[in-house]
Amino acid sequence: MTRAEFFRLMAGGLSSAMLAGPLSAATGGYDFWFTRLRYDSGDWDVDQRTPSNIITSLIDYTTLRVDPKEHVIALSDPRMLTAPFCYIAGHKLVEFSPAERQNFERYVRSGGFVMVDDCNHDIDGLFARSFEAQMAKIFGPKAMIELPDSHGIYRSFFKFDGPPNTALELNGWGDDLVHEYLKGIEVNGRLGVLYSNKDYGCEWDYDWRNKRFLAEDNTKFAVNIVMYALSV
């Protein structure tokens, strides 16, 4: 059973009252809906055009039935447990409440997939240090690993030799480093947390009308991430 199939079953098991609101898409015949997680600390609502650009690319390149709307739901809300894919980003402190921590762990251990993007592009920045500390508390200090360039996420739809660089890191934003790898946390052989210090959120945050000026569509890697999340 794929991750997407599992979470459709979970959604089907919830009461109609619980499904009312942002995740009602779970019963609307969609294969994918973009869920941004709101957390009480920090700045969760960054890169506001990124979700719509990812959604557009999924519609353009794949045959998935994609909900055209972004859904924002609190990490502390149990309805997030039915989402096939969740997104967290920010620049500032990540300090989960007990309810947020419980849902994050339950979601990932149950087979969920969370993409986490450090908008600072800084491995020593506040977001990076505090988020990694949260992951160590939940999954243990050695749970976060470097993903090799041979990882399936780089071949799930388009072909990549490794994580694509962003214009921001090439131009010296943040820690002035080009980060050669992504990190992740695996549970029972499945990648449950994908963690990036490359600031993909800012890279994909642009007016859709400017996409025609790109030599290469930089949201293709976002398509890979989603397709990987749904297929394993």
Where are these regions (language model features)?
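Short alpha-beta junction capping motif
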Residues: 34, 85-128
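Alpha-helical scaffolding within the catalytic cores
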Residues: 70-75, 97-103, 177-181
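N-terminal export signals
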Residues: 5-26
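Glycine-rich, histidine-containing beta strand-loop boundary motifs that form or position
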Residues: 10, 117-118, 148
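Aromatic-Pro/Gly-enriched surface loop or interdomain linker
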Residues: 21-85, 89-92, 200-232
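An acidic, glycine-rich "communication" segment
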Residues: 42, 50, 121-207, 214-219, ...
